Amino acid sequence: MIKVLFVCHGNICRSPMAEFILKDMARRAGVGQNFEVASAAVSCEELGNPVYPPARRELAKHGISCSGKTARQVTPADYAHYDRIYYMDRSNARYLARMLPADPEKIRPLLDRDVADPWYTGDFTQTYEDLAEGCRKILEEF
């Protein structure tokens, strides 16, 4: 079982989108049972809130549901539990460096560039495409 945690600022846009994109891709590839996938925030600003409506709509356009997902914050227990922790941008990396042990094999960027935060850009389609690119790479790696 490969355990993957996606992390972004608030756990209402990018990281839950990545969580459900990877779950969907793994299921469609017939390897869903080989993955445990979750997401979390580096901040506590959105704790308990559902996925942001435009992010839900973008996932729904691709036939993906994120029903029931609520924001939670990353914890030290996540470091012990997950095999890989993928962050979305350099700001997330700085927060994680204060929260978890340094471990570049386990904690790494999803892409070789920042995944723009659609909370600010409003471009949920581009975010979806970037996240799908990163999730495809994860599937290829494992």
Residue ranges and their predicted role:
Residues 78, 84, 88-142:
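Phosphate-binding/catalytic loops
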Residues 1-79, 142:
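Conserved active-site segments centered on acidic
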